[in-house]
Amino acid sequence: MADNDRTALRRKALRRGLMSEYVAAVFLMLKGYRILALRHRTRLGEIDIIARKGDLAVFVEVKARHGEAAAVDAVSVIAQKRIRAASDLWLARQADQARLSQRYDIVAVMPGRLPRHFPDAF
């Protein structure tokens, strides 16, 4: 495969990921969550969405797949550890950290269907 083809595929995947994260964020807002950050980057990794509902901080991994099971299975143990490490850094910077509970969710974004939210997925 030529470099141009690989670059085009990467760009397409990035666009799909960005759109999926936006769709997931809107979906979560409709469910009453306040979105605090999209694509939050730390030195330990990236968190797709950081949301809050009351005293609950939710760290969300978004996966665009054709099915729910494929989306959930796509979040590897290594990815879970990376997200947890990044969330620890984010939490350490919050003034009300002691009050906050935390949860790790997955939102599956599938073509032609509403997103599916998996609370407390890992």
From Swiss-Prot:
UniProt-listed Gene3D superfamilies: 3.40.1350.10
The organism's place on the tree of life at top rank: Bacteria
Database matches in Pfam families: UPF0102
Gene Ontology MF terms in the entry: nucleic acid binding
Transmembrane segments: none
HAMAP family, per the entry: UPF0102
Similarity-based family: Belongs to the UPF0102 family.
Protein name per the record: UPF0102 protein Rleg2_4331
Organism annotation: Rhizobium leguminosarum bv. trifolii (strain WSM2304)
Lineage, highest ranks first: Bacteria, Pseudomonadati, Pseudomonadota, Alphaproteobacteria, Hyphomicrobiales
